[in-house]
UniProtKB/Swiss-Prot annotation:
Signal peptide: none annotated. This is Beta-2 adrenergic receptor. The lineage of its organism: Eukaryota, Metazoa, Chordata, Craniata, Vertebrata. It comes from Meriones unguiculatus. The chain crosses the membrane at residues 1-21, 33-55, 77-100, 123-146, 201-224, 232-251. It is found in: Cell membrane; Early endosome; Golgi apparatus. GO terms for biological process: adenylate cyclase-activating adrenergic receptor signaling pathway; norepinephrine-epinephrine-mediated vasodilation involved in regulation of systemic arterial blood pressure; positive regulation of autophagosome maturation; positive regulation of lipophagy; positive regulation of MAPK cascade; regulation of smooth muscle contraction. A lipid is attached at C191 (S-palmitoyl cysteine). Residues 56-76, 147-200 are cytoplasmic. Pfam families: 7tm_1 (PF00001). Binds NHERF1 and GPRASP1. Interacts with ARRB1 and ARRB2. Interacts with SRC. Interacts with USP20 and USP33. Interacts with VHL; the interaction, which is increased on hydroxylation of ADRB2, ubiquitinates ADRB2 leading to its degradation. Interacts with EGLN3; the interaction hydroxylates ADRB2 facilitating VHL-E3 ligase-mediated ubiquitination. Interacts (via PDZ-binding motif) with SNX27 (via PDZ domain); the interaction is required when endocytosed to prevent degradation in lysosomes and promote recycling to the plasma membrane. Interacts with CNIH4. Interacts with ARRDC3.
Length: 251
């Protein structure tokens, strides 16, 4: 997730800013498509990584004793690799092979113009890439993370009840045995730490969704009904998504 945000900040945002400020593209057709590919790659990798993190937390919460054996470091590396492969197949392959290209006159003119880098896509690519890059991971992420919070909440309630009964029945023993009190405090601190981590991940996922959902809604609408969404709105919402890369380090 950090790598995707870093690449977005170093390789996508500066060229995007130059494109808007100068109102033209100064880096040629090849770099236009390569830059666009990196853009789609980073967005796809970001949300799919968040989706994988949600599944990881779900397994950690629901099957804590099996977690270490189920998710080893090698398996984690394979999953991360798969995320970037899928992201590459969604971005670089169709863009570099020109499968994404629209056939209307305005789009064709832009493709042949060295100073134009507007992202004109055909309907099939716009909808398919939005589904693979955003909507499917979003649905999985929301469903899994809602389950994670439900399970975590129930576990915290059980721990609170257990500690309450323990203190009520064995207060004098706890006072005499420092080790028992230390064990309870350690258990409570661990649960609070896990709960805080879940809240932080929830904020990251929520921020990402709020930043990118408007753009992907507009992206699909634009693919179905051309000229319905003003270009300025499209660019503004795209930059709202870019801003998300600056939020994660702060969160």
């Amino acid at each position: 997730l950090a790598c995707a945000g870093l690449v977005m900040g170093l390789a996508v945002v500066p060229f995007g800013a130059s494109h808007i400020l100068m109102n033209m593209w100064n880096f040629g057709n090849f770099w236009c498509e390569f830059w666009t590919s990196i853009d789609v790659l980073c967005v796809t990798a970001s949300i799919e990584t968040l989706c994988v993190i949600a599944v990881d937390r779900y397994i950690a919460i629901t099957a804590p004793f099996k977690y270490q054996s189920l998710l080893t470091k090698n398996k984690a590396r394979v999953v991360i690799l798969m995320v970037w492969i899928v992201s590459g197949l969604t971005s670089f392959l169709p863009i570099q092979m020109h499968w994404y290209r629209a056939t209307n006159k305005e789009a064709i003119t832009c493709y042949t113009n060295e100073t134009c880098c507007d992202f004109f896509t055909n309907q099939a690519y716009a909808i398919a890439s939005s589904i693979v890059s955003f909507y499917v991971p979003l649905v999985v992420m929301v469903f899994v993370y809602s389950r994670v919070f439900q399970v975590a909440k129930r576990q915290l309630q059980k721990i609170d009840k257990s500690e309450g009964r323990f203190h009520a029945q064995n207060l004098s023993q706890v006072e005499q045995d420092g080790r028992s009190g230390h064990g309870l405090r350690r258990s409570s601190k661990f649960c609070l730490k896990e709960h805080k981590a879940l809240k932080t991940l929830g904020i990251i996922m929520g921020t990402f969704t709020l930043c990118w959902l408007p753009f992907f809604i507009v992206n699909v609408v634009h693919a179905i009904k051309e000229n319905l969404i003003p270009k300025e709105v499209y660019i503004l919402l795209n930059w709202l998504g870019y801003v998300n890369s600056a939020f994660n380090p702060l969160i």
